[in-house]
């Protein structure tokens, strides 16, 4: 066994390096996983910029992680064995608080997200709770598999709002999560309307079959959404950008008796016209991380309902992660999704 392994460590804001760290030690309830592939997430970029208040430094990054189980632990599901390829559920809950007691473990009062609150999976070998694993399908390339994690975030918002066939859903933000939410909405039989200020992302979404795209910088967004929905506005709105103005706009985009999922994380407080919440009797749902969506996400990728190659802009080597984190921070418009492999 190696005494030290390579890891991607964020020493402080704007300083991310490949460094050696001790080989992980596991408890009885943990597994050890030989990491094979990983995704770079927006939260990694926020940590790099120093804008994520939940991150402390130094921190090993990464929560979109796929690899092979090399040591078993108590609590592994019956279908997982040593040697199996798995994706990790990166949300570690206490199991004791009120949200955990009602099955809403993603709302745990002391939730620990790997790569954010505790060290993450961008390293050669990781220790992880044995019960937080899902076996992955055999028919997907290794570099595509980490995409299932951000897809669970998109699916969770659709589930929170109980999106139904035939409904319109406005999705604000045409990044990876917003685009996958739109593609998943099509699979649900719903009608997505994708809103963004980056025209190239909207045009790309249209090339993938998203018929309705709206750029508020180029047209009257309220008027256009009203036209698409025959005057009703959208029964469901998902906010996936975290921009304050976009959060405010959810109240205008939603129909009377509409439902809103807030998925994006704003950096500052957002003043809202709360009279609209009462006037329209809107249901507003926080949509944090995910809960129980990994199997559906993996199935969507494995059956090509969502084509991973349409989302992943670039696949890089592990050692290239620091330079691409820097470039992604400086030029986010150039990449939809970057995944890495060993």
Swiss-Prot record:
Pfam families: ADH_N (PF08240), ADH_zinc_N (PF00107)
SUPFAM superfamilies to which the protein is assigned, alphabetical: GroES-like (SSF50129), NAD(P)-binding Rossmann-fold domains (SSF51735)
EC number in record: 1.-.-.-
Enzyme class (EC, first level): oxidoreductase
A molecular-function term among this protein's GO annotations: oxidoreductase activity
Cofactor binding, per record: Binds 2 Zn(2+) ions per subunit.
Reported cofactor(s): Zn(2+)
CDD domains recorded: Zn_ADH7
Residues holding Zn(2+) 1: 41, 63, 149
Full protein name: Uncharacterized zinc-type alcohol dehydrogenase-like protein HI_0053
């Amino acid at each position: 066994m190696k005494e030290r392994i390579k890891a991607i460590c964020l020493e402080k804001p704007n300083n991310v390096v490949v460094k050696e760290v001790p080989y992980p030690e596991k408890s009885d309830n943990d597994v050890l996983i030989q990491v094979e592939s990983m995704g770079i997430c927006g939260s990694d970029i926020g940590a790099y910029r120093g804008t994520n208040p939940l991150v402390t430094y130094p921190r090993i990054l990464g929560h979109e992680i796929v690899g092979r189980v090399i040591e078993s632990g108590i609590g592994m599901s019956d279908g997982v064995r040593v040697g199996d390829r798995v994706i990790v559920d990166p949300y570690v809950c206490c199991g004791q608080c009120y949200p955990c007691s009602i099955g809403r473990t993603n709302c745990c009062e002391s939730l620990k997200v790997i790569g954010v609150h505790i060290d993450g999976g961008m390293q050669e070998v990781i220790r992880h709770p044995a019960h937080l694993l899902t076996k992955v399908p055999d028919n997907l390339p290794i570099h595509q598999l980490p995409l299932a994690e951000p897809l669970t975030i998109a699916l969770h918002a659709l589930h929170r709002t109980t999106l139904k066939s035939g409904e319109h859903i406005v999705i604000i933000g045409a990044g990876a999560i917003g685009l996958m939410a739109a593609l998943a909405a099509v699979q649900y039989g719903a009608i997505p309307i994708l809103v963004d200020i980056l025209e190239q992302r909207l045009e790309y979404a249209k090339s993938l079959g998203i018929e309705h795209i709206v750029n508020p910088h180029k047209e009257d967004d309220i008027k256009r959404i009203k036209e698409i929905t025959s005057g009703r506005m959208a029964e469901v709105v998902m906010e996936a950008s975290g921009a304050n103005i976009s959060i405010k706009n959810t109240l205008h985009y939603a129909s009377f008796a509409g439902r809103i999922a807030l998925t994006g994380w704003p950096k500052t407080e957002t003043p809202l016209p709360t009279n609209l919440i009462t006037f329209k009797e809107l249901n507003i749902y926080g949509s944090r991380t995910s809960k129980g969506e990994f199997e559906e996400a993996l199935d969507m990728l494995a059956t090509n309902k969502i084509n991973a190659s349409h989302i992943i802009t670039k696949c890089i080597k592990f050692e290239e992660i620091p330079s691409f984190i820097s470039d992604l921070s400086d030029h986010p418009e150039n990449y939809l999704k970057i995944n890495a492999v060993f």
